[in-house]
Amino acid sequence: MADARRRYSDDVPDDVEDRLRSMCLALPETYEERAWVGTRWMVRRRTFAPVLGVQDAPPGPSVLLAFRSTGDELEVLRNAGHPFFVLGWGRDALGMVLDDRTDWDEVRELVIESYCTMAPKKLAALVEP
């Protein structure tokens, strides 16, 4: 998500962070920590869902969630357009703008898929879709 032209911040609304926290910490062996900017949720020292603010994103400040995806869904999301975008690092890394139109059921599915992509297979097998 790093882009030298952007001003990143920890400015993520509490309700957004709380929703993500609830989703992420419900997954096996996950934990939360402060990232270089924003917050990230991890499994076994691997980040699966960082969230942060971007102050100078067009059309104005935005909140971004990064996640991992695979297979057909990865290709669909790469080409879907707003609110999705390619991060520019990692072949399976995507981002999503979180705003008042966000479909939180979809976010939950994406967070679970990202977790299953990053978690050891034994932990991923414990997750119900």
Placement of each model-derived feature along the sequence:
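Charge-dense, helix-prone N-terminal extensions
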Residues: 1-129
